[in-house]
Every structure is written in C-alpha cells, then in structure tokens.
Amino acid sequence: MKIVVSRGLDLSLKGAPKESGFCGKVDPTYVSVDLRPFAPLPLGVKVTPEDQVTAGSPLAEYKLFSGVFITSPVDGEVVEIRRGNKRALLEIVIKKKPGISQTKFSYDLQSLTQKDLLEVFKKEGLFALFKQRPFDIPALPTQSPRDVFINLADNRPFTPSVEKHLSLFSSKEDGYYIFVVGVQAIAKLFGLKPHIISTDRLTLPTQDLVSIAHLHTIDGPFPSGSPSTHIHHIARIRNERDVVFTISFQEVLSIGHLFLKGFVLGQQIVALAGSALPPSQRKYLITAKGASFSDLLPKDIFSSDEITLISGDPLTGRLCKKEENPCLGMRDHTITLLPNPKTRESFSFLRLGWNKLTVTRTYLSGFFKRKRVFMDMDTNMHGEKRPIIDAEIYERVSAIPVPVALIIKALETQNFEEACRLGLLEVAPEDFALPTFIDPSKTEMFSIVKESLLRYAKENVVTSS
C-alpha cells in the first residue's frame, strides 16, 4: 500500500549531522535504564545499589503482570535508583563494565511454541519494547493486539535513518537479516502479519518479508513518520477495544539479535545534533544504550549554562538538567543541543524574519514556498501564553484529521468522553508536537495530551486489564 500525506510541515532545522558523518565509537562509564515510559504501570524494582548485573538481568518488573521484566542492556554495577515526585521511578543508573557483554542466550525460534515464546519475550525484556494504542501506553500482556505496526519511516528532526542504524552490523545485509528474524518472532508471537511502514528510498528484503508481513510505503512531510498517521491510513482505531501495538525498527533489531545471535543488543546509534553544537561536533556515534551525556559530549559544551540539553529530538524529546548527569532515554537516539538565550530579541516584532519559521505568514519567510534551512532555532518562546484564537492553523500541520484545538479544550476540562469522540483514541502526545511548535498561543499541547493520557490510562485501562 502506498500512502501519500500532504498535510504537515517539512522541517529543515539547522544543526543536523551530515548523513555521511562518521560513526565513532564511545564506551561510556555510566548508562541508565529509563523507566519514565512505564509511568502508567506500577513497577517493582528487582535490584539495589551495588548489585552486579549482566546484560539481560531483570531490573524491574510489572507489579500487575508478574513475569514481565525490564532488563539491563549491559554488564556492570547498579550505582543509583533515581526517583521523582511521589517517589516515582525515573531510571536505574549502572556503572558499565568496559566492552560488550558476552552473556549468551540460546533460544530456537522455530521450536518454541507461541506460549513459550511469550514467556521468553516477558522474561528477557522484549515485551517491554512494545507500545499500545489507544492511549500510547506500554503494551499489556493481557491484550491480544488486532495489528502490530513496525515503523521504518520515522522522520522527526535529527533522528538517525534506518541506514544509520544498520551501521551497527558488519553489513547492511546482516542487519536486514536480523530485522527479518525479529519480524518472524513478532508474527509468531501474536499469530498475525505485522504492518511494516517504510519509505520509497529504502530497499527492504521484500522476498523475505512479503510472506510474513504487510508492506507499505509512505511519503510526505513531517509527521508522516508517526505511528498515528500509519494506523489512521491503514487500519483506524475506532473504539477502546481496538487494540494495536507499535514498535520501532531499532527495537525489532533488538528482538532479532537476541534470537539470531544469542546476545542482547546493548549498543545503539546516537546523533549529536542541534544549532548550539559546533559543526565539527555534529556526528553519529555508536555507544551503549542509555549512555550518559557527559561521556558523549565535550566537557565545555556539556557544562555551559547557555545551552539546553534534550534527550531525543527537539520537538518530542525530554528536557534534561545538567546537574543530574542525564542519560539517553529508553527510545531516544538523539541528543539535541539548543541555544538558551538569556535576553529577548530587540524589536523582534519589527524584523522581516527572512530566516524565521512561520505558518501564518507573520514573517517574510512565510511567503516563499521553497524549502529552506531555518536559522538560529533556540528555546526563546517569543512571547507569553495567549488565548487560542485561530484553530485552523493546527489542522494545516496535523497529518490526521482531528480537531486539535477542540481536543485540547476537552482535555483541559477533563472531559474525556468528548475528547474520545473527537479522536483522542487515534493520537499520541507526539502528534501534538508540531501544533505546539507553531502555536501562536504558546499552549503546551504536547504536555497537556501526555498528562491526560497518562491519567486516563491509570484510572481506566491499566486497572481494568
């Protein structure tokens, strides 16, 4: 199936590494296992500081679903268990042993029954890689998904391409074969043919995939690479019982690597990007999953007060505090550095704005349709919060036809029934990142949707499963 998306915004932000950039290798001293994505689920910690762990060792367990573990990607020693407000689990920090783990696993995918395969996924931390729709929560083992969507079309700013992720392996063919094994495992686990969404420029091993998966291509501006867009065009979610799972290309590689090679895939590709980073420092690295920023960034840049650190891309990533020695998030493959101006731009309202981004033609750049690299992207809000006046501008950049402003208003009043009627079942917080970015009212739509989905899932979805 060929999908063409016309709505969205083709972001060309300054600070991206060159696609041909060299993949250097960094073996970090510290890594963390990010537990923030599991906020809807109560977790039980299985380790304490000073415990020795190996790759694949259980670090945390779903309290409501015993036997489902979140595991360590590396060998090392647990040094800290970080908690936030109300003692919410944030991450488990590990002092990594040098080198790659040699902990060997032996699973024969062909001989495992579907029931045994599920136990392997739960025990080895593979089930924790899936996300569940509606409500964009960690997948629940009690649910049988209608469909599984595998995303190879992610086009968020600065996100490494599929080709870059294949740099982890000896050859592109080797990487794709590992991916095929991962797809085979998913197809057998759920007894279905998953949907694989890629772009036209990717050359997939279609002969190996066509018998075990549905293959689709998508073309269009950001956010055409979001799972919500794929689900909407291929098989829409129409009610709360319409459960689908989503998973990324990198996570399928982790599944295939365990079954084919017998080792936990503890490494990942990371992009160092952002307009605050000198061009010579914008590059791709091969490093451990969850690596600490201090091991990946130059000391003078990491400690600068004039730079904002983000784990992930600039639109959906997590804002990090330097004093906490931040680490990469669980699903993050980018470290973004943006300038943090201390003063407002003088007479900004009188400037032509040739290099400024606008959707409403507030600046001169809005009258030119040619693709341009927008300069000097920083954390300046350029004003304070205002009432929402023009609701139509959000629909121009939303890849799926949902009334963005009406959903936000329903969520702000906690009217979940109305929000679901308007399309909340089809969306995730990331779908509101672009409306938040171009919003003249400065409303934090991304945060509103994220907090609302978390609250609703805790009260209605997780407890009833």
Swiss-Prot record:
Transmembrane segments: none annotated. Its EC number is 7.2.1.1. InterPro entries: NqrA, NQRA_2nd, NqrA_C_domain, NQRA_N. NCBIfam families: nqrA (TIGR01936), PRK05352.1-1 (NF003758). Composed of six subunits; NqrA, NqrB, NqrC, NqrD, NqrE and NqrF. NQR complex catalyzes the reduction of ubiquinone-1 to ubiquinol by two successive reactions, coupled with the transport of Na(+) ions from the cytoplasm to the periplasm. NqrA to NqrE are probably involved in the second step, the conversion of ubisemiquinone to ubiquinol. HAMAP family: NqrA. This is Na(+)-translocating NADH-quinone reductase subunit A. It comes from Chlamydia trachomatis serovar D (strain ATCC VR-885 / DSM 19411 / UW-3/Cx). The gene is nqrA.
